[in-house]
Swiss-Prot record:
Signal peptide from the UniProt entry: none
Keyword terms, alphabetized: Amino-acid biosynthesis, ATP-binding, Cytoplasm, Glycosyltransferase, Histidine biosynthesis, Nucleotide-binding, Transferase
Coiled coil: none
Domain note: Lacks the C-terminal regulatory region which is replaced by HisZ.
Protein name: ATP phosphoribosyltransferase
Any one Gene Ontology cellular component term annotated for this protein: cytoplasm
Gene: hisG
Metabolic or biological pathway: Amino-acid biosynthesis; L-histidine biosynthesis; L-histidine from 5-phospho-alpha-D-ribose 1-diphosphate: step 1/9
InterPro entries, sorted: ATP_PRibTrfase_cat, ATP_PRibTrfase_HisG, ATP_PRibTrfase_HisG_short
GO molecular function terms noted in the UniProt entry: ATP binding; ATP phosphoribosyltransferase activity
Highest taxon of source: Bacteria
Biological source species: Bacillus cytotoxicus (strain DSM 22905 / CIP 110041 / 391-98 / NVH 391-98)
Catalysed reactions, semicolon-separated: 1-(5-phospho-beta-D-ribosyl)-ATP + diphosphate = 5-phospho-alpha-D-ribose 1-diphosphate + ATP
HAMAP family: HisG_Short
Subunit structure: Heteromultimer composed of HisG and HisZ subunits.
Amino acid sequence: MRNVQIALTKGRLEKHVIPLFEQIGMDCSEMMDKGRKLTFKSNNSNVSFILVKAVDVATYVEHGVADIGIVGKDILMEYEKDVYEMIDLQVGCCKLCIASIPAYDPKKYRKKRIATKYPSITSRYFCDKGEDVEIIKIEGSVEIAPLLGLVDAIVDIVETGKTLQENGLIVLEEMYPISARMIVNKAALKMKKDEIFNIINKIECIVSKK
């Protein structure tokens, strides 16, 4: 069997996804005590893993460095990479939301300023609504931007809402549901069809039982 390389998102999503691969019989023990390592081999299969930042997973898959990737739907919507989206894994579930301070009135007729890590998604969303907004991209914690008067509102991922609450913000509108997706390199799906679909079919069986 040909080797298959899988790119995983480091951090929170990684913890949700590794158990799925273990359930289909892959040995992921190397990743349990990984230290600073970013590449791993499954000892009982033809699969190897790499751990990268969320924004890089789809890039590695698009360019064929990884055959399969696991990444949030938010990243796929923002960067629109040329890959196949195969499965909604139904883990890492959260929502992309518009949030601001309680006193903010979104119905005020003026151009709004929105801070976000997702300028492309945000631009398309407000364009579809016919609203003219100024978008300011912020890479760090966007929650502080409305408090300092930089923007009127933010667009960000909300899981429990605790971070918003701790910073005095509320959800104004839920935009999109977000969850982890399995993506595949287009060329790899042809060259390693049997190996990749073997993984996909097993994962689908696990997900369908949830």
